[in-house]
A protein has these predicted regions:
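A single, central transmembrane helix in multi-pass transporters
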Residues: 1-48
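Helix-to-loop junctions at the C-terminal end of transmembrane segments
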Residues: 49-63, 147-148
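Substrate-agnostic recognition of the 12-TM MFS/MFS-like secondary transporter fold
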Residues: 2-14, 46-47, 51, 93-144
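Transmembrane alpha-helix termini and helix-breaking/packing motifs in multi-pass membrane transporters
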Residues: 16-27, 56, 138-157
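Structural signature of the two symmetry-related core transmembrane helices
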Residues: 65-79, 160-161
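Helix-loop junctions at membrane interfaces in 12-TM secondary transporters
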Residues: 81-94
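Multi-pass alpha-helical transporter architecture, strongest
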Residues: 56, 81, 152, 158-181
Length: 181
C-alpha cells in the first residue's frame, strides 16, 4: 500500500508541476521548455548517481527511514512551490528525492521478494509490480481532474495531505520480516 501511495504521489506531483510551471514564471529557468529539460535531466542524473554511487549511510538505513525521508522530501517540494518560489530549491529537493528513490527502490523490491515463500514469488511479485505501476497513470489522471475542477492550490494541498498521510502510515507501518506462505 505505501509503495502504491508513494507512486501515486510522485506521478501526481510530476504531472501537476508540469502544468503549474506554465503559470508560475518565478519557478521557470528561462523558458518553460528549458525548465522541463532541466527538470527531467536532474531527475535522470540523480537516478543514475543513486543507482551507481549510493551513500552507504542512506543505503544502510531501514526501509522505514528511507520511506520517511522520501515522503518528507515530497512534502518539502510541495511547500517550496508555495513558499519559496525558487527553482534552485525545488530542483535541489528533486535531485535529493530522485537520488534517494534510486537507492531505496531496489531495497523495497528485495524486501517484497524475501517476505514471500519461493513458490509464490513470481505470482505475488507480478501482482505487486502491476499494482504499483498502475498508480502512475492513475495519479496523473486524478490530479489532472482535480486541477481542472478545483484548481492548482487545492490540488497541491491534497497532495500535501497525501504526503502527510504517507509519513504517518510509514511511522506505524510494520515491516514484514518473515516469509509469507
Amino acid at each position: 500500500m505505501i509503495y502504491s501511495s508513494m507512486n501515486l504521489l510522485s506521478s501526481a506531483m510530476a504531472t501537476l508541476l508540469m502544468i503549474y510551471l506554465l503559470s508560475v514564471k518565478e519557478l521557470q529557468l528561462g523558458s518553460y521548455a528549458v525548465t522541463i529539460t532541466v527538470f527531467e535531466s536532474i531527475e535522470l542524473v540523480a537516478f543514475f548517481l543513486g543507482s551507481l554511487f549510493p551513500f552507504d549511510f542512506y543505503r544502510k538505513l531501514s526501509i522505514r527511514s528511507n520511506l520517511l525521508f522520501e515522503n518528507s522530501l515530497a512534502l518539502l517540494m510541495i511547500i517550496s512551490i508555495f513558499v519559496w518560489h525558487n527553482p534552485i530549491v525545488l530542483f535541489t529537493l528533486l535531485f535529493l528525492s530522485s537520488y534517494a528513490t534510486a537507492i531505496s527502490n531496489p531495497k523495497s523490491d528485495t524486501i517484497v521478494i524475501f517476505s514471500i515463500v519461493e513458490e509464490r514469488q513470481n505470482a505475488v511479485f507480478s501482482i505487486f509490480s502491476t499494482i504499483v505501476t498502475a498508480t502512475v497513470p492513475l495519479g496523473a489522471a486524478v490530479i489532472l481532474a482535480l486541477n481542472q475542477s478545483l484548481g492548482a492550490t487545492w490540488s497541491w494541498t491534497l497532495l500535501a495531505f497525501l504526503a502527510v498521510f504517507n509519513i504517518g502510515y510509514t511511522c506505524f507501518w510494520k515491516e514484514e520480516t518473515r516469509a509469507v506462505s
